[in-house]
């Protein structure tokens, strides 16, 4: 069994816990590699075990951080590697265990007392080309000029679904329904469902409403306004795009895999939503 370790880089407690996990696994006789960025912020790991995250080829990744750490892993790894996530963030919608339970969780993982929770992702094509990361949470099309709305049309499976004047449009997975989409007025969607959400950001008039569509759907977005936009993926990747761009969002063939110790969704998600608000 081979493990990879990735930690939140701006939090010393996360880096120290990552080292303790690394030491525990090495002493236990397992092969362990460490993310290069983690090492650069805490250079106490054996340098021979340090490789770029993009080159991880392991059985499990131990992620010590918040949702942002998980999103970084998902954007950079080339394989769908199961992630055991330790919460060193704020709310931690995606994380599984608290820091105090880290070594108990590792023991259960080693003993095979877990299951794999698979989550859908969405893939973005820009003028027919896929050159940006898949999104675990959402793809957001945003106004390139703060205070100026954008005018766009979006189509679902070839049919015009809506013409929107708004600050932008969010195309979200069920996992992302508790993030940007919810802030824009979208619903909570059980992450086990195979659906896609389309949520306008502050539309004018407010007749443009959020939609939940089948996960097999294709969403095509074109701009009516002659204005540059920003494409944002999971709040991690940003790119300015010209007004004549055509954007397509579909379900990705890849999935995110989480190590879980319980199949319970509720009340975890509902409690975290209340904490957030």
UniProtKB/Swiss-Prot annotation:
Active-site residues, as the UniProt record annotates them: 67 (proton acceptor)
Amino acids binding NAD(+): 67-68, 72, 137-138, 148, 165, 167, 178-183, 202, 236
Keyword NADP part of the UniProt annotation: yes
Enzyme Commission number(s): 2.7.1.23
A Pfam entry, by short name: NAD_kinase_C
GO cellular component term of the entry, any: cytoplasm
Keywords: ATP-binding, Cytoplasm, Kinase, NAD, NADP, Nucleotide-binding, Transferase
Name of the top EC class for this enzyme: transferase
InterPro entries membership: ATP-NAD_kinase_N (IPR017438), ATP-NAD_kinase_PpnK-typ_C (IPR017437), NAD/diacylglycerol_kinase_sf (IPR016064), NADK (IPR002504)
Location of the protein in the cell: Cytoplasm
Function: Involved in the regulation of the intracellular balance of NAD and NADP, and is a key enzyme in the biosynthesis of NADP. Catalyzes specifically the phosphorylation on 2'-hydroxyl of the adenosine moiety of NAD to yield NADP.
Name listed for the protein in its UniProt record: NAD kinase
